[in-house]
C-alpha cells in the first residue's frame, strides 16, 4: 500500500474526543484482573488533569460477553446499554468513556445499528421505559479510555516526576 493510501486510512480512523465531562463505564473484566488501571485512569483525569469523570456506582456490565457467547439476546443488550445512556443523561453528561473494549465495541455497534435501523432504537426506548421508566440521549462523544489517555498524553507527560532515560547517556531506557 502506498503512503497516500495509509495516510487516508489513518485520517478516516481519527475522531474527535471531548475535552471534559466524561461518564465512565467500568469494565467487568479489567477491574477484576487490573483493578489499579481503573483507579489510575480516574485519578489521572480527575485529580491530575482536573477533568470531570463520573464513575456512577449504578453502572452495570454491558452484557457483551453474554451476547458474544449467544446467551444474551441483542434486544436485552440494547436495553442494558440504553440504561447506561440514561444514567449518563440523568447525570447531565454527554460524553461516554468505556474502560472495556468489549463495551466500546457494543456501544459503537448499537449506535450504528440505531442510526441505520431507527426502529431498533424506538423498540429499545420502549423496553427501557417499561423496565425502568427511564429515557436517554445518545452520547455526543464515545471514546475508549485509551483514546482519552492518548489525547492528553502531552499534559500527562508534562507532570512526570522522573524521566525513563539512562542517567549517563540521556537515551530512553530499553525496558
Please name every model-derived segment.
Residues 1-175:
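Iron-sulfur cluster-binding electron-transfer modules in prokaryotic oxidoreductases
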Amino acid at each position: 500500500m502506498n503512503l497516500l493510501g495509509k495516510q487516508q486510512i489513518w485520517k478516516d480512523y481519527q475522531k474527535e474526543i471531548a475535552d471534559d465531562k466524561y461518564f465512565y463505564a467500568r469494565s467487568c473484566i479489567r477491574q477484576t484482573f487490573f483493578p489499579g488501571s481503573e483507579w489510575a485512569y480516574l485519578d489521572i483525569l480527575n485529580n491530575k488533569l482536573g477533568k470531570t469523570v463520573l464513575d456512577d456506582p449504578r453502572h452495570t456490565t454491558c452484557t457483551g460477553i453474554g451476547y458474544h457467547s449467544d446467551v444474551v439476546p441483542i434486544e436485552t443488550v440494547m436495553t442494558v446499554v440504553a440504561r447506561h445512556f440514561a444514567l449518563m443523561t440523568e447525570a447531565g453528561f454527554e460524553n461516554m468513556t468505556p474502560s472495556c473494549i468489549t463495551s466500546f465495541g457494543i456501544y459503537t455497534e448499537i449506535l450504528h445499528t440505531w442510526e441505520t435501523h431507527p426502529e431498533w432504537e424506538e423498540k429499545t426506548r420502549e423496553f427501557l421505559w417499561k423496565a425502568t421508566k427511564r429515557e436517554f440521549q445518545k452520547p455526543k462523544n464515545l471514546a475508549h479510555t485509551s483514546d482519552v489517555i492518548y489525547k492528553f498524553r502531552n499534559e500527562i507527560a508534562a507532570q512526570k516526576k522522573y524521566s525513563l532515560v539512562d542517567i549517563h547517556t540521556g537515551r530512553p531506557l530499553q525496558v
